[in-house]
């Protein structure tokens, strides 16, 4: 009350803080997934509000929250075509037509994006490096990730690309 009355403050922005599901991104879109025991400790908007509202309500201020990533993160995907498959005997690579200029987050932050075949596959999963065509060592979407074996012409979906994926894209190389 003191903040509002003595200082003329009307709003309190608590910022963001709500993350998204990177692993199980696709499965977490199903309500049944959230009923699992493993999901009980995940911070949801309801749990966030239940924790903060009782503490902030006495201030008498309008509370602002910035849930952008929570809303848009899993709303976008990057679909890419496998251009070439390379097996060195020690490493298995899927070289795709998307590159770090299309989704820079893995190169910048080593961020995790679930990668799945667009067409469901019963192929055996193999540890795969999914890499782009740019001549940079950072043009890598994942390393040693178990992904069903792919072939040239297959399409992969990189999930959780909705927040910042497009706005951070560039025209490099």
Q: Residue locations for each model-derived region?
A:
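Charged (often Lys/Glu-rich) extended helix/loop segments that serve as interaction or gating elements
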Residues: 51, 60-173
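Active-site loop/helix belt of alpha/beta enzymes
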Residues: 1-81
């Amino acid at each position: 009350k003191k903040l509002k009355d003595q200082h003329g403050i009307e709003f309190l922005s608590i910022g963001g803080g709500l993350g998204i599901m990177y692993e199980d991104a696709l499965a977490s879109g199903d309500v049944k997934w959230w009923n699992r025991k493993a999901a009980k400790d995940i911070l949801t908007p309801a749990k966030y509000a239940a924790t903060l509202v009782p503490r902030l309500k006495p201030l008498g201020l309008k509370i602002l929250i910035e849930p952008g990533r929570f809303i848009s993160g899993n709303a976008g995907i990057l679909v890419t075509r496998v251009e070439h498959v390379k097996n060195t005997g020690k490493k298995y690579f899927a070289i795709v037509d998307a590159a770090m200029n299309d989704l820079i987050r893995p190169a910048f932050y080593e961020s995790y994006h679930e990668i799945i075949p667009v067409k469901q596959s019963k192929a055996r999963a193999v540890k795969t490096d999914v890499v782009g065509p740019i001549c940079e060592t950072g043009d890598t979407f994942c390393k040693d990730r178990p992904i069903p074996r792919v072939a040239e012409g297959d399409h992969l979906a990189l999930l959780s690309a909705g927040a910042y994926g497009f706005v951070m894209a560039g025209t490099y190389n």
